[in-house]
From Swiss-Prot:
Localization annotation: Membrane
Keyword match Mitochondrion: no
Membrane-spanning ranges: 167-187, 190-210
Organism (species): Saccharomyces cerevisiae (strain ATCC 204508 / S288c) (Baker's yeast)
Null mutant phenotype: Cannot grow under anaerobic growth conditions.
Official protein name in the record: Putative uncharacterized membrane protein YDR149C
Membrane topology: Multi-pass membrane protein
GO cellular component assignments: membrane
Keywords associated with the record: Membrane, Transmembrane, Transmembrane helix
Further details from the record: Partially overlaps NUM1. Disruption phenotypes caused by deletion of this gene may also be a result of a defect in its overlapping gene.
Length: 235
């Protein structure tokens, strides 16, 4: 079964690898060959033995270069997402200034919405220690719930007839994909046994995406357009 990957590379990411690859074609060949190699390893490597996988990665210079590439790409993506997060914050602040939010449920960005500080999570805990011991289709969801436990944000709003938190909405969006797409589960298990450097970069990426998603959900829940949509939906 072929393994297709759609890749979008920003200019900042490409500049960081310009010295390592003579041309973009060489970079793309290396990237897609790496994913094909990963897909093949999913079939032959026993994922129940993480020591076997780690030793295989450490002994293979090609795989070590690949994991360095992925880690650097994620860190570059984090920088882009931080800029996006600041842009979202400015947009929400402009909504407050224009009174687009509920007058009764108006919230303060500085008091109720907190940026994630990576310093609080700069620990040497590998990602596989956060995952449950048993493997299954819920491993990815369990990882998200573990992040929620660390962030202490899994709180349902008692004033809403339905669960109001972004955690509930994210679970609704993610769970069907995790249960139906087997390759996503395999890929999440594969990254769970990656070296600690890559695991931490993936973990920080999840936290940053979570921060952006939570901001959007909290703003939309209090936005007048959502109120109008709810009124029309009731009819």
């Amino acid at each position: 079964m072929p393994f297709f990957v759609n890749v979008k590379i920003s200019k900042s990411v490409f500049r960081s690898f310009r010295l390592s690859f003579s041309s973009f074609q060489d970079f793309s060949v290396f990237f897609f060959n790496s994913f094909n190699c990963l897909h093949s390893m999913l079939k032959f490597v026993n994922l129940d033995s993480k020591s076997q996988f780690k030793s295989l990665v450490e002994s293979n210079s090609f795989m070590k270069d690949f994991f360095w590439l992925v880690s650097s790409s994620i860190l570059s993506l984090n920088d882009s997402l931080i800029c996006l997060r600041d842009l979202i914050c400015s947009f929400l602040a402009s909504l407050e200034d224009c009174n687009f939010l509920h007058s009764t449920n108006k919230f303060s960005l500085s008091s109720k919405v907190k940026f994630i500080s990576f310093d609080e999570f700069a620990v040497s805990t590998p990602l596989w220690e956060l995952l449950p011991a048993n493997s299954g289709s819920t491993s990815f969801v369990s990882l998200l719930l573990k992040i929620l436990e660390i962030e202490n944000r899994f709180v349902l709003s008692p004033s809403s007839p339905l669960p109001h938190s972004s955690a509930f909405k994210l679970a609704i969006l993610v769970t069907p994909f995790v249960e139906t797409l087997s390759w996503l589960n395999e890929l999440s298990m594969l990254f769970a046994y990656c070296p600690a450097e890559l695991s931490l970069s993936l973990f920080f990426l999840c936290l940053l995406l979570w921060d952006i998603f939570e901001r959007l959900v909290e703003s939309l829940d209090r936005c007048v357009f959502t109120r109008l949509y709810s009124t029309l939906w009731s009819y």
